[in-house]
UniProtKB/Swiss-Prot annotation:
Subcellular location: Secreted
Name under which the protein is recorded: Muscarinic toxin-like protein Tx-NM3-2
Major subcellular location class: secreted
Tissue expr: Expressed by the venom gland.
Length: 65
């Protein structure tokens, strides 16, 4: 499985997930209205929601754009 680690305007950085991590995630944490900090990568399971977070999980290559 290949997940996006960072996304830029015209490019992206990817990572190959190790054995046992078969989920890609895209987590957006609200810093203040209109401003989010995004975290992307591989995980064994979908991360738990925390206060003011939005999380998207998927299991195909580069699905966490």
């Amino acid at each position: 499985l290949i997940c996006v680690k960072e996304k830029f305007l015209f490019s992206e950085t990817t990572e190959t997930c190790p054995d046992g991590q078969n989920v890609c995630f895209n987590q957006a944490h609200l810093i203040y209205p209109g401003k989010y900090k995004r975290t992307r990568g591989c995980a064994a399971t979908c991360p738990k929601l925390q206060n003011r977070d939005v999380i998207f999980c998927c299991s195909t290559d580069k699905c966490n754009l």
